[in-house]
Amino acid sequence: MQILDGKKLSQKIKESIKKEVEELKKEQDIIPGLAVILVGDDPASHTYVKMKARACKDVGIYSIVHEMPESISQKEIEETISMMNKNPNIDGILVQLPLPKHIDTTKILELIDPAKDVDGFHPYNFGRLMQGLDTFAPCTPLGVMELLDEYGIDVKGMNACVVGASNIVGKPMAALLLNRFATVDICHIYTKDLAEHTKKADIIAVGVGKPNLITADMVKERAIVIDIGINKVGNKIVGDVDFENVSKKASYITPVPGGVGPMTIAMLLKNTIKAAKQRKRS
C-alpha cells in the first residue's frame, strides 16, 4: 500500500506557482488577483478563507476578501460580483459556500464571469468540462487528478466508482475520470446496494461526509481509494473511509488529513494563474 501524499505534492505545486508568479510579474507585469466573497459567521468557512488567503500570499497572488454579514441581501452580493467582474486587477472570483438560506446560490454562481470562475462552478465551465474541453474544473476533483498523475496512475480502462453526486465534487469527479477514459459508476444517497458497486471498482472516490462509510469488505484487493470526505469525530478529523482497515487492502490510498484537502487549495492557485494568463492573452 502506498500513501497518496497531497500535502507533499501541494508544496511542490506551490513552489512551482511561486516561480510562475515571479515570471509573470517580471516579464509581463501581471500580478494575478483573487477576490473571495465570504458571507456570515460560519467558523469553517472563515477557516477555509484564511487558508486560501495565506496560500495566495505565500505564492505572491494578490487576494482580497469581501466579508459580508449573514443578513446581506441577494442584490448586494450580486452588485459585489458585478464589480469584481469589471475589475481588471481581479482574475479569479470565489464565493465561499455555503451561503445563507435566503440567498439563491445558483443565481450567484451564474453571475460570475466564466473567465474568472476559478472554482469551476459556472454552468458554462461545467458544460465544457462535460464535453472534455479545456476549462476551469472544480478544485477538489482537479486536485485528485493531479495526485493520480503525480503517482503515475493512469485510469484509462479502469472501473471507477464515485460515491457522492454533488455539483462541487461528485459530478465533476466523474466527468474528469470519464474524460480520461475510465468506466464510471456514480453512487448517491438513493443507491440501493453501495457495496455492489464499490467491490467492482479499481478506483473509488468518495466524498459525502459520512465517517467509515467505506469499509474493508466493500473494497477489492489492490483498489485505489480516494477519500474526499472531511468529518470531525471528537477531536479528530477523519474521512469517509475506514482508513485503518481499508489501507490493508488498497494499493494506493489518500489519508485524511493530508490527502485531497491540501490539493484543493493548490488547484485554486493553479486556476487563478490560468485565469491571469488567459486575461493577458485576450
Curated annotation (Swiss-Prot):
It comes from the Bacteria. Its EC number is 1.5.1.5, 3.5.4.9. GO terms for cellular component: cytosol. One of its GO terms (molecular function) is methylenetetrahydrofolate dehydrogenase (NADP+) activity. NADP(+) binds at residues 164-166, 189, 230. InterPro entries: Aminoacid_DH-like_N_sf, NAD(P)-bd_dom_sf, THF_DH/CycHdrlase, THF_DH/CycHdrlase_cat_dom, THF_DH/CycHdrlase_CS, THF_DH/CycHdrlase_NAD-bd_dom. Homodimer. PROSITE patterns: THF_DHG_CYH_2 (PS00767). It catalyses: (6R)-5,10-methylene-5,6,7,8-tetrahydrofolate + NADP(+) = (6R)-5,10-methenyltetrahydrofolate + NADPH; (6R)-5,10-methenyltetrahydrofolate + H2O = (6R)-10-formyltetrahydrofolate + H(+). Pathway: One-carbon metabolism; tetrahydrofolate interconversion. Keywords: Amino-acid biosynthesis, Histidine biosynthesis, Hydrolase, Methionine biosynthesis, Multifunctional enzyme, NADP, One-carbon metabolism, Oxidoreductase, Purine biosynthesis. It holds the Pfam family THF_DHG_CYH_C. One of its GO terms (biological process) is methionine biosynthetic process. Belongs to the tetrahydrofolate dehydrogenase/cyclohydrolase family. This is Bifunctional protein FolD. Gene3D superfamilies: Leucine Dehydrogenase, chain A, domain 1 (3.40.50.10860), NAD(P)-binding Rossmann-like Domain (3.40.50.720). Catalyzes the oxidation of 5,10-methylenetetrahydrofolate to 5,10-methenyltetrahydrofolate and then the hydrolysis of 5,10-methenyltetrahydrofolate to 10-formyltetrahydrofolate.
